[in-house]
């Protein structure tokens, strides 16, 4: 299954490049349309999609190939987030959140159909003084 978030991300990157290359207002407006098309598709994925989208964008912008979930996820959000990820082709993701109940959230991901593969090191959204992403440990999951 195609990763719909990656497809939207690529379209968003095209929109940004088109906007940066635009030489007049008409070309800028065309670039904006591309942006709105990418975002509109995400909006159609459901309530949890915007949360996933923000995390997906951040993950890709910092050089990660997979979605990294780093923000707080409440227990009751897990089934909907997992359903959205599965329905839209997220086969692998990492989880680097460090809040108090994060281990329970990781357990819930497994209960909802993702298998823990182990630890990996990823680029976080935080950067050092030189603009390099800081490396952080994360749990990697794949769909069953």
Predicted segments, located by residue:
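Generic structural signal for short, flexible, solvent-exposed coil/loop and linker residues
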Residues: 82-84, 105, 130
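C-terminal edge-of-domain segments
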Residues: 116-144
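Ser/Thr- (and often Asn-) enriched beta-sheet segments in non-cytosolic proteins
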Residues: 92-96, 115, 140
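General "foldedness" signal
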Residues: 33, 107-109, 123
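An N-terminal amphipathic alpha-helical segment
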Residues: 1-101
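Short, aromatic/basic amphipathic alpha-helical patches
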Residues: 103-115
């Amino acid at each position: 299954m195609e990763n719909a978030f990656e497809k939207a991300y690529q379209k968003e990157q095209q929109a940004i490049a088109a906007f940066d290359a635009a030489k007049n207002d008409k070309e800028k407006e065309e670039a904006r349309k591309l942006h709105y098309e990418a975002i509109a598709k995400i909006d159609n994925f459901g309530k949890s999609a915007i949360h996933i989208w923000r995390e997906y964008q951040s993950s890709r912008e910092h050089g990660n190939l997979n979605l990294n979930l780093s923000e707080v996820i409440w227990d009751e959000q897990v089934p909907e987030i997992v359903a959205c990820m599965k329905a839209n082709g997220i086969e692998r993701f990492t989880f680097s959140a460090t809040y108090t109940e994060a281990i329970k959230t990781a357990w819930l991901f497994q209960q909802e159909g993702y298998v823990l593969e182990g630890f990996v090191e990823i680029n976080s959204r935080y950067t050092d003084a030189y603009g390099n992403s800081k490396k952080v440990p994360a749990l990697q999951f794949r769909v069953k």
